[in-house]
Amino acid sequence: MDYELVVGLEVHCQLNTVTKAFCGCSAQFGKAANTNVCPVCLALPGALPVLNRQVVEDAVKIGLALDCRIAPHSVLARKNYFYPDLPKGYQISQFEEPICSDGSIDVELDGVNRTIHLIRIHIEEDAGKSIHDIGDDTFIDLNRSGVPLLEIVSYPDIRSAKEASAYLQKLRQIVKYLGISDGNMEEGSLRCDANVSLRPVGATEYGTRTEIKNMNSFKNVEKAIEYEALRHREILENGGVIIQETRLWDADKGETRSMRGKEFAHDYRYFPDPDLVPVLVDEAMIERLKLELPEFPEMRARRFAADYGIPTYDAGVLTVERELADYFEETVKLSGDAKTSSNWVMGEVMRTLKEKYLDIAEFSIRPARLAGLIQLIHNKVISNTIAKQVFEVMLNDEAEPAAIVERDGLAQVSDSGALEAVAQEVIDANPKQLAEYREGKTKLMGFFVGQCMSRMKGKANPQLVNDILLKKLEG
C-alpha cells in the first residue's frame, strides 16, 4: 500500500525582548546560572506577574506578517503540569483565545510553491533548564524561566521532510526580518516539534501521530521526520499499530526513542490565569505596528532586480538575510555601482563571512569602506586583481582603501610608454607563441596578457595592456 506523509509543526520562537515575559528580569542568553531571576521567576508566594507589552506587540507583528486574524481580546491561561524546571507547577500560555489565528506561510521547494496554513500563534513563557552534565547530580537553572515565546502552530499541510525544513527556514527568515528573534536553533531561540503520521494515499482521515522533539537544526528536522516516517511505514506494513506518543530525536544514533505518552489538551487542565488581565489589542495598535513592518524578502528581491538591474538569482541571494540586504543597499548608495557592489558582496564578502563564521553585523569592512574600494576600481585607480589584495588588507587594517593603495604602492599603471616596453619584452621573450598566434591561435592573447600582468605585479591597466598587445601582435 502507498502511504502519504502528513506533518504539522509546532514552532517555539524565543523573542529577543530586553526583559522576560512577566517580570523585569533580563532575558539575555548565556548568563551564569540563576542570576537572571526574581521572586516571579522563582514562583515565590505572593509574587505577581505583569505582562511585557513588547511581547504583545511582537505577537501582533508576526500575526500581521503571516496574514493572521488578530484577536482584539485574548486570554492568558495556566497550563498545569509538573516538571522540575517549572517552579510554579504551571506554565503561563494561551489556550481557547490565542492572540493570532489562521494565517499562512508560502514556501518554494524545487520550483513549486506551496501554502502551509496556520492554526494559531499564541504567547507563552519558557520553562527553566535541567542540567545533567555536572557529576551525578541534576541541577536547575531558572534563567530561562519566564523568557517570552511565541508558539506558531501549523495545520498538518506539510507532505515531506524537505518541505518541513523549507517551512521552518522561511519562518526563521520572517522572524529575523521582523527583528523579534535571532532564530538561532542551536541556542534554542527557535525550537521545533513535529507531529508525524502516515495515511493511505487518497484517504481523508489522518493516521495516528507521534510528536518528535529535540531537533536543533534544519538538517535534523529532515532526518528525524524521514526516520519517523520509515518507522511508521514498517509498523503498518507488518500489521502493527502506531502508538500516539512523544519521541525524542537522537542525532548521534540517527533515530527516535520513546519519551512519554502523548498528552491531550485536557491533561493540562487549562484555565484563565486569575493573576493576569485579558490582552487587549485595538485598531490603533494594529495600524501603528503595520507601519513598522519591514519590506519582506520576496518584495525586496523584486525591487532589487528592477531598480538595480541585477539578475533575479542575485537579488534572491542578497535578500535572504535582512542585514545582508541592508549592507548591499548601503554599498550601492555610496558607490553608485549596483552591479559591481552585487559582485563584491556575493563574492568576496560572503566568502569571507563563510570562512570566518561571521554574521554581516560582525564584518569589519562596513559599506562605506567597500564602496570606497569599488570607486577605486570604477575610476581605474586599481584593477580587480589588485582590489582583491586591498580587500584582504582591509580585513585587518582600518585604513581607508585609497590610503592602503597609496601606502603600499598598488595604484594601477596606465602609462602607455611603460606598458608598451613591457609588452615588447614579453613578445621578444616568446617567439614560439608569437609565431603560433600569427598562425591563427588567437587564444594565446590570454598568455601574453598574463605575462605582462605578471611582470607588472598585477598593477598594469589590463584593458590598455590588451590594446597594446593586440596592436603589436597583429602588426
Curated annotation (Swiss-Prot):
It is an enzyme of class 6 (ligase). This is Aspartyl/glutamyl-tRNA(Asn/Gln) amidotransferase subunit B. Allows the formation of correctly charged Asn-tRNA(Asn) or Gln-tRNA(Gln) through the transamidation of misacylated Asp-tRNA(Asn) or Glu-tRNA(Gln) in organisms which lack either or both of asparaginyl-tRNA or glutaminyl-tRNA synthetases. The reaction takes place in the presence of glutamine and ATP through an activated phospho-Asp-tRNA(Asn) or phospho-Glu-tRNA(Gln). InterPro entries: Asn/Gln-tRNA_amidoTrfase_suB/E (IPR017959), Asn/Gln-tRNA_Trfase_suB/E_cat (IPR006075), Asn/Gln_amidotransferase (IPR018027), Asn/Gln_tRNA_amidoTrase-B-like (IPR003789), GatB (IPR004413), GatB_C_1 (IPR042114), GatB_Yqey_C_2 (IPR023168), Gln-tRNA_amidoTrfase_suB_CS (IPR017958). GO terms for biological process: glutaminyl-tRNAGln biosynthesis via transamidation; translation. Keywords: ATP-binding, Ligase, Nucleotide-binding, Protein biosynthesis. Heterotrimer of A, B and C subunits. It catalyses: L-glutamyl-tRNA(Gln) + L-glutamine + ATP + H2O = L-glutaminyl-tRNA(Gln) + L-glutamate + ADP + phosphate + H(+); L-aspartyl-tRNA(Asn) + L-glutamine + ATP + H2O = L-asparaginyl-tRNA(Asn) + L-glutamate + ADP + phosphate + 2 H(+). Its EC number is 6.3.5.-. The gene is gatB. One of its GO terms (molecular function) is asparaginyl-tRNA synthase (glutamine-hydrolyzing) activity. The lineage of its organism: Bacteria, Pseudomonadati, Chlorobiota, Chlorobiia, Chlorobiales. The keyword Ligase applies. Belongs to the GatB/GatE family. GatB subfamily.
